[in-house]
Amino acid sequence: MPLNRRNFLERTAVTGAGVALAGAVGAVPAEAEGLAGDGGARRKKRYALTVMGTTDLHGNVFNWDYFTDAEFDDKAHNDVGLAKISTLVGQVRAEKGRRNTLLIDAGDTIQGTQLSYYYAKVDPITGAGGPVHPMARAMNAIGYDAAAVGNHEFNYGIPTLRKFEEQCDFPLLAANALDAKSLRPAFRPYVIKRVCTPHGRDVRVAILGLTNPGIAIWDKANVQGKMVFPGLEEQAAKWVPKLRSMGADVVIVAAHSGSSGTSSYGDQLPYVENAAALVAERVPGIDAILVGHAHTEIPEYRVTNKESGKQVVLSEPLKWGQRLTLFDFGLVWERGRWQVESVSAKVLNSNTVAEDRRITGLLVKEHRKVVAYVNQVIGTSSAVMSAAEAAYKDTPIIDFINHVQAETVKAALAGTAHASLPVLSQASCFSRTASVPAGKVTIREVAGLYPFENTLEARLLTGAQLRAYLEFSARYYVRTAPGAPVDPAKLTNAESIPDYNYDVVSGLSYEIDIAKEPGSRIVNLSFQGKPLDDAAEFVLAVNNYRASGGGNFPHVARSKQLWANSEEIRNTIIGWVKAKGSIDVGAFASVDWKLTRDGVPVF
């Protein structure tokens, strides 16, 4: 429930100095107090503190890929999961002394794997007598001190998030998540940890949590009218001086926001999506920022604050528990308080250690339940469908997603005023490793096509708007001159556009001329064999992320909504396969778009 002034103060347990103290840990000094130097001058008191950080865990406890039913592996041979992180954390605590360390997270915790999905939807933590979320159990056992709220925390709705918050032994922080009516904090903005030293003078470490303002777009259906999300810079400027005035010696921000200064949603919001470096540059008083959201590995990135001239150290530990950030703080006792003398950061790779059996043993039953669930056979397929080339070729696997979406929307609009309009469909290649085999098909194989918690909508668009939509999508390809060699590995993701922000639209035929400048690449655009009529109206089956403005595609966010569904598209596809019993690939697979250069096909 949103915090009011009274219960906020009660929950932060303010002291006489007005400082929120959420626990105390003892410490061993980096340099003992004593006499040294000429004249018996007393040495300065120094202390070393290490703050560890994770981010974007996305439901990963085990080093396991539920979609492939095997241990996780990628081209870089990364490992994933909190069980691996727990081993690293244990090693750091053994080296530094547990009392000299803290452990925090920068958000996106409860969405992303079939494990997290199972305990949100199949055996939900919100049910009567429901289970404790596996991520809460693991993080509690490891001993987290605080975690920021990520945007994907809202994917399953606020009740699920609140239940997860209740199950955690550590606070969830989000200074820029406000109750829509009172504009008071909807979560705890910060926590201050008191770290005890043998000098009798505690170090007060403030952790400020900031989430992503894009939640207002991406999870509009779950948060509209309930919460608002102002900018990171604005809220950091409000809270950091307060934390310093409360006596914080160290200020760390856990920010679910990348460091690039860019926004995938363009000018739809006045707040920057990836604002961590801007916060460091413009808000004085911050010592370090644990960065999240961007799924990037940043061992150490130093930003000079424009007002104070001091350097702020940023670090982002990639994603999924693949890395653990270590911030090492050197503190010195000066002028009656602890001062930060030095800060450095680095990351540890979780593929260098074994899983902590304490964590795997704690959740092995939950893991086995989910493995059994995803391996249920739900139908058959007449042919293999693979996404390996789906980013640059029209493939049956994307056609399948679009076929199910279009059929679902047509059925939903039957008997309405728009039932006679042609239905098109939008889909992206979310995973290039997704594959559906010929023969028996399981839940995990179908679920692997759609790893996100998106839901389906129907939007009304004109031919001209669809043309602009496709042109925007085609920016994804690197401009390649006619006759030049083509390397598929280097052909896509121009301007750092991720695969999920490149859309294929089924129901139309078109070519993408990658020899042309972005904005003029769509050629031979037609509908049912005739040039597309700019004035004609169409229904577009589209996911809620795109319909809400995700990716900043033109027109769709402001278009008329004809229908919306609360069921995840993944489950819609699974339900379709269960109902049909078989996937007849020949019934929907066709090549309707292709890449060209001056009219010559690239492939």
Mark where each language-model region is:
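Acidic, metal/ion-coordinating pockets
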Residues: P2-V19, G26-T352, I397-E407, G415-T416, ...
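Feature captures C-terminal
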Residues: R42-T50, N60, D73, V80, ...
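Short, flexible loop/turn elements at secondary-structure junctions
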Residues: T55, T197, N212, S259, ...
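Short, solvent-exposed loop/turn motifs
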Residues: D202-R204, S386, S509, P531
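Acidic, glycine-rich low-complexity/disordered segments
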Residues: V364-N375
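Glycine-rich phosphate/diphosphate-binding loops and the adjacent beta-loop-alpha structural elements
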Residues: Q376-D394
